[in-house]
Amino acid sequence: MMTNDGKRTLTRIKNQDNIRNPIVELLYKKIEITNKDAEFLYSVALLLIDEYSKEIEKGIDKNLLIEYAYFIIATTAFKVSDFRALYDFSINYGYYPIARKIIDLDLLSDMNINHVMTNSRIDKFEDGDKILTYQQKKVFEEVLDDKGNAVSFLAPTSYGKSELIFDHLSKNEDKNYIGIVVPTKALIDQVYREAKKKVKDRKLIIHDQNYSKSEDKRILTITTQERALRLVDEGVKFDILYIDEAHEMLNFDYRNNLNNRSLLLTRLIKLSRAANQNLLELYLSPVIGKASNLEIRNSKTISDHRISKDLKILNISFLNSEGNLKYYDRYLGEFIDSEKMIRSHFDYIIEQSKNKNLHFLYRPRYIEGYAKLLYEKLPFIEEYEIDSDIKKLISELAEIVHPKFKLIKYLSKGLVYLHGKMPLIIRNYVLKYVRESRFLSHFVANSVILAGMNLPIDNLFYISGYSNSRDLYNLIGRVNRLSDIFSKENPSLNRIFIPVHFIEMDRFPQNQQGSLAKKIEKLRGRIKDEIKNPLLENSTIATTNSLKAEEIIETEDNIVNSYLTPDFKSRLTRSGAQQLLNYTEQGLQKLSQRFEENQNYIQDDEILIKVKELFFDNFEDFDFSPNYSVDRLKNIATINYYKNFIYNLNTKSLHERINNLVFFWKSKTDSDYQIYVGTQFGEVTRKTENYIGQNLVYVDLSDHINDEDYLYNLAIIKLQVDEDYVSYEITLLLNTLLEFDIINQKQFDRFIYGTDSNEEIKILRLGISRGIYRKLKQDDMIKNIHFDDYGNVKANSLLISYVNEHGVRMI
């Protein structure tokens, strides 16, 4: 079917004042309307439906026309409290959850035999405790019946992606090696929790080092692409790959060269295909325009199964920096003046707040600054009004992190902020409360936290972000999940309207000073794919990037084609060093020779020194072009710092490490001491012979040495920045040393885990933090951890009681 979204028709309506003006007046400005007004709006909707139907018969899908008709009918129904037209529309166009909800809530004033009969026909669209739309049921069946080996499920957020994965898995029980690939560690945790409930006959693997080639014959892996690639290196030949959030494949930044995660995801698919010609692939995304845009160069086509009709209706408002409040009609493509002036942005935010409000900003620094201002504006809450579970959380965080951790006081007003520079274990623990606690009503976060996450959000305040409309659609889809809208506990239908408030604040600008108004305008019409990954068939490559693209394609092809007999560059790329250091051909020759000459055993405490010597010493600028963050390892001071950091990471609690770091900083009061924190929280640049950029990546401690609150909260961030650095940059370089037999597996384990005990490592690889493991070991709880026949961890009743009692205090 041809796609013509109907934008031109709607633009013609906008340009005819005799139609446009009453539509705008009745939909956006008049709170109460008459029956005559309603008749006019319904007549407009019928004309749109008629035009849509005529075009469908011609094979043209003008989807915006039917969407606008639905918007008009639903809005009118609520204004006049008469739901007959909405019920009839829902029955005729397969919006069955709405029709059933109208019946369940007794919203039809003149229920008759026809309503009873149509309601009974909806029963065949029941799926457990929910009702599917006509299109939803149809597409589910198409995906499950598709005999092709590359299939896509493209549907709005909350339309049953997780259920489809596990239904598809049930239909393929004969397959032994299954992988679900997700973009973030937080999403690993979420999918793992779902899998534990539904999968009982496989080993569930969330880390590549959980896998044993000799023991594990039936597995379900839930990993990022990095971990999945390491599983392939360990010999896993996947039978099925589920690519969650598949739109991530489209991304690419040529400044990062081989260090692009989309490249690794594409490599995983290509290697898995090479290992198993019968590989089944299921791509899942809420924000892909065409499935063909996911296709890798010179390879198989991907069938397109799409749910295009969304039950949720966007109510978009825009408060600009001057205080002008406007509404945006995404069908007419027009901002409509509310004729209201808002004196305070935060007063508006508080006034428009609901039960669970998401405040979105893209930079961690902005998140913390905004959260501080919001906290100051929120009304005071008496201690006796704070829920007991939140009081417990406050107490735990004060003990385990630090009493000066500013999130603690924010919790007392029902406010949480999270970003990727906060300790991972704390993030996951606090997210549990965001999901479960009604007291926590304000959640300030960015996409690092939200990617793919299911949270009970019912209101969105969008403050600042990137220009990508795909990410914006994905974010909006997180608000009011279908399961929440149509649950038995929800006594209203009005949650089909999704409140999206765009708030323009000068102190929290858009990425690259972009226009928030123009970003809103991108919500009109279909999603347009921006295909930047050079490995994809439909990639758009600028002339300035063509040589880089050719080199990347050649490198990736070589990795796949020579996988069993890789050359030096392929081994270096697969193990991780090349994506960080970008050696030239001359540099590769030097490095290869060094590796050949360094086969003698090295002591554990010399490993980081060896990293410096092998990868950095005596290389010239024309030999390599390392990323700045990894280039810091050429300095002996950095090496010594991370040796000490890793020792403390393996031996001390988070609370101890925070106190020690602040104590150390205070000892530097007489010197010009700057610490590296990266671009998210950096305040100054430090020019050296190796770095002359303008990025603010350092903090000058002399500017803050008398501000203890600042120091302790900076320490929390700094420790996570360094832990990420160890987990990524340093671990990739160590993985390369392991690949070339310069260190052995036991040395690698001692460095990363602080132990080479197989029993301890088996437990640490489950994703348990070092702090939790130390606490379990100290209290003799390790004996209460068991493994089932497939190797899945099980806790007995004693351990479950212990965990419930201690909570986050184990960290």
Please give the residue ranges for each predicted region.
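N-terminal helicase ATP-binding lobe
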Residues: 1-811
